[in-house]
Amino acid sequence: MAKKPKKLEEISKKFGAEREKALNDALKLIEKDFGKGSIMRLGERAEQKVQVMSSGSLALDIALGSGGYPKGRIIEIYGPESSGKTTVALHAVAQAQKEGGIAAFIDAEHALDPAYAAALGVNIDELLLSQPDSGEQGLEIAGKLIDSGAVDLVVVDSVAALVPRAEIDGDIGDSHVGLQARMMSQAMRKLGASINKTKTIAIFINQLREKVGVMFGNPETTPGGRALKFYASVRLDVRGNTQIKGTGDQKETNVGKETKIKVVKNKVAPPFKEAVVEIMYGEGISKTGELLKIASDLDIIKKAGAWYSYKDEKIGQGSENAKKYLAEHPEIFDEIDKQVRSKFGLIDGEEVSEQDTENKKDEPKKEEAVNEEVTLDLGDELEIEIEE
């Protein structure tokens, strides 16, 4: 690249200095009007990374790519009936309490089973529960809890059950076109900034509906309009697969079901990953089962025939005996869990960078190319002005 004339360099410096001064004056004026921290360079932010909280499931943490749910973000969990949506959300509640946080459950469906929640590890004595009379009331309660900054997790079960007051006060058969969608759109606009500011995780459980007259494509949709789809940083599609049979005397009895959780949207890691978990009836996600499977695939736990072994020590013949061993030896469970997470670069409560649209390896080269292009364009313009 040819060296710039001396006069051209002086003009460039003067031009750049004036722009920098104008920018600094504008930043000072914005901070004066709206307060310190209202605008800043991204590199000056104290928190450039997104903190995460474990979902309570190792397989789901891996599928999420970041090690859990991002704090200060909206999560949507949807799927067919009895697919395990509430179970997935309750595991998040139990995990939040385990980490010393406070969780709230907005039960719009009025269907929460305290005994089942306790079986999943939820401390029901500490859980904040609200069963609102209308959708507006439920969202207002959620908003006040989030604004307080004292709640770490808010679960709304479910969006479909958030019935607008006008619909409740009206008669059955009255038309209320778009009423719930407008309510959710307004709620998302109000809650979005507050959720991010307080670092609260907001989980919205949603149901499925079918579009009438769809001949091609997926006819499934979720109620409540499109606002939640846009504002959600993570969307999980939960689907029940095959039934799990028991062993011994229960070999003909269904004791659980294999459930597939697909990450259909993810703003902090690559999307479209899947997690397959075993949801045992009355117990929730089998943590020993998912750890045994993943650790075996990574060869952390060795499998020879029907025997499972760890560090040359046999831990059980058959998967059920190996699961039982892991459940009875929590120190071994935690040790293997840490090894698995380290393999995937996941640590509980870690911070992860925002996912960029381009490959990170190419970023420095692209940035240099952009800077060089801008400099050349500026120089060409200045040379033309001098010639004139």
From Swiss-Prot:
Superkingdom classification of source: Bacteria
Keyword Cytoplasm (UniProt): yes
Record's compositionally biased regions (Basic and acidic residues): 357-369
Pfam families in alphabetical order: RecA, RecA_C
Record GO cellular component, one term: cytosol
Any GO MF annotation of the entry: damaged DNA binding
Chain residue ranges for the region called Disordered: 347-372
Keywords assigned by UniProt, alphabetized: ATP-binding, Cytoplasm, DNA damage, DNA recombination, DNA repair, DNA-binding, Nucleotide-binding, SOS response
Residue positions binding ATP: 79-86
Main localization (coarse): cytoplasm
Database matches in Gene3D superfamilies: P-loop containing nucleotide triphosphate hydrolases
Subcellular location, record wording: Cytoplasm
Signal recorded as keyword: no
Biological processes annotated in GO: DNA recombination; DNA repair; SOS response
NCBIfam families per record: tigrfam_recA
Family label: Belongs to the RecA family.
Purpose of the protein: Can catalyze the hydrolysis of ATP in the presence of single-stranded DNA, the ATP-dependent uptake of single-stranded DNA by duplex DNA, and the ATP-dependent hybridization of homologous single-stranded DNAs. It interacts with LexA causing its activation and leading to its autocatalytic cleavage.
Name of this chain's protein: Protein RecA
Classification lineage: Bacteria, Bacillati, Bacillota, Bacilli, Lactobacillales
